[in-house]
């Protein structure tokens, strides 16, 4: 066992002495040492109860014959960090989480790992760190919260609350109606109830085979979720005791698993952030997965499940009751060749064996391929002179009339500037809002743009205004919102040289994003270019700015300058 490095031999007497201080006894030194990476934190609704999960996992590991060691990672709530400079820290937190997993696991030579994430950057951060360690690993997330309901019974969620701010600013709803939404949008603990970033990533854990079935859809703190937590703990001990490299994470999360994740992502219309995170995960897994490959997948996968924010009446609990992610994968597999069904999973089954008996229980929630919302996937990578290295759009959330769009640019050099401009009614129908210098380097930190996109929706401009940015979006964003524009403005990308009134063209079917301005005009602008720079005071963000790559590379940190 890997942990023999710290517990076997006469020369490890000091090490054992320290371990005995934590309560270990003679018999424990022959058992596998299991790391429990918890992400318990009080301020995040999806995490404040995870200390209870940690205790359940500890007890189950001991009962199964392992020795558990809990450690914690940090976490950022993107919703609470939204719309102010706190959002600068969201994406960088992914790197801290990955580094912390690697540090604790390798410093103490633990044999196996069970990760308890739930929200946004915590899931991919834990996956990235676990891949570096490459020991047997199981993920068991906290689970989604239930959808909320207004007093009149209308289902709502966090996206409703953000859009309500724009509606209130326009006088479309009263103070009382806004308060009703505020108090009921997030009714319980768990990751926010739609197919936002957290639930997208928790769902993809199932597709990659690194979590148990139901990980992305079974509600938080329910008896079924608790049983899943116990089962995951039991399984990690079985994997650790086997002491077989076939269970090491990179042998499960391989190139085929990355492909499977993107297939399910397309079928369910996941968050655009999944592109950023899956590209980063692929790099940590040693998988060469060029961004262009995503469109090849999208063009062949039907979009069969539409969930909030794309369809506001459907939430993760509805998907669970309709058969869950297994039912989605089973339906996808009816069109042969889309999923690698022979790929292993942490349960010991192949993916094909896992989904063999899955059934769609409600075809109004999970559609058949032939009755899909679209015969192409819910995400698209756009290319063109504005995005020579790619940009990302969630096609699942775009109205049909906005999938081909030409509009005139109105430019903002930061998210706060854009929010002010939108609130002051500077944005008109037919505009393309450009928010730049918000990329990984420019922000730095690549802020999410939920506040401006929600304002656009709430103010009734969602079917007549597009938005492009080198920043990114919340999974709760909908509309013609194109993010991750690469190269970013801070790298001298063309987005830096757009001026008010320029024509911008997008076509999601053709994967096109183009600035319709002549090369001569662009060359003249470049000759007189004075780059905009955000003032960065934080030492951590300055380090991040120096090391981060662009979005087309997953915004991972470079290991060499």
From Swiss-Prot:
The keyword Iron-sulfur applies. GO terms for cellular component: cytosol. Mg(2+) binds at residues 78, 120-121, 448. One of its GO terms (molecular function) is dihydroxy-acid dehydratase activity. InterPro entries: Dihydro-acid_dehy_C, DihydroxyA_deHydtase, DiOHA_6PGluconate_deHydtase_CS, ILV_EDD_C, ILV_EDD_N, IlvD/EDD_N. The active site is at 474 (proton acceptor). It holds the Pfam family ILVD_EDD_N. Pathway: Amino-acid biosynthesis; L-isoleucine biosynthesis; L-isoleucine from 2-oxobutanoate: step 3/4; Amino-acid biosynthesis; L-valine biosynthesis; L-valine from pyruvate: step 3/4. GO terms for biological process: isoleucine biosynthetic process; L-valine biosynthetic process. Its cofactor is [2Fe-2S] cluster; Mg(2+). It is an enzyme of class 4 (lyase). The keyword Magnesium applies. Binds 1 [2Fe-2S] cluster per subunit. This cluster acts as a Lewis acid cofactor. Keywords: 2Fe-2S, Amino-acid biosynthesis, Branched-chain amino acid biosynthesis, Iron, Iron-sulfur, Lyase, Magnesium, Metal-binding. Transmembrane segments: none annotated. Functions in the biosynthesis of branched-chain amino acids. Catalyzes the dehydration of (2R,3R)-2,3-dihydroxy-3-methylpentanoate (2,3-dihydroxy-3-methylvalerate) into 2-oxo-3-methylpentanoate (2-oxo-3-methylvalerate) and of (2R)-2,3-dihydroxy-3-methylbutanoate (2,3-dihydroxyisovalerate) into 2-oxo-3-methylbutanoate (2-oxoisovalerate), the penultimate precursor to L-isoleucine and L-valine, respectively. PANTHER family: D-XYLONATE DEHYDRATASE, D-XYLONATE DEHYDRATASE YAGF-RELATED. Belongs to the IlvD/Edd family. This is Dihydroxy-acid dehydratase. It comes from Sulfurimonas denitrificans (strain ATCC 33889 / DSM 1251) (Thiomicrospira denitrificans (strain ATCC 33889 / DSM 1251)).
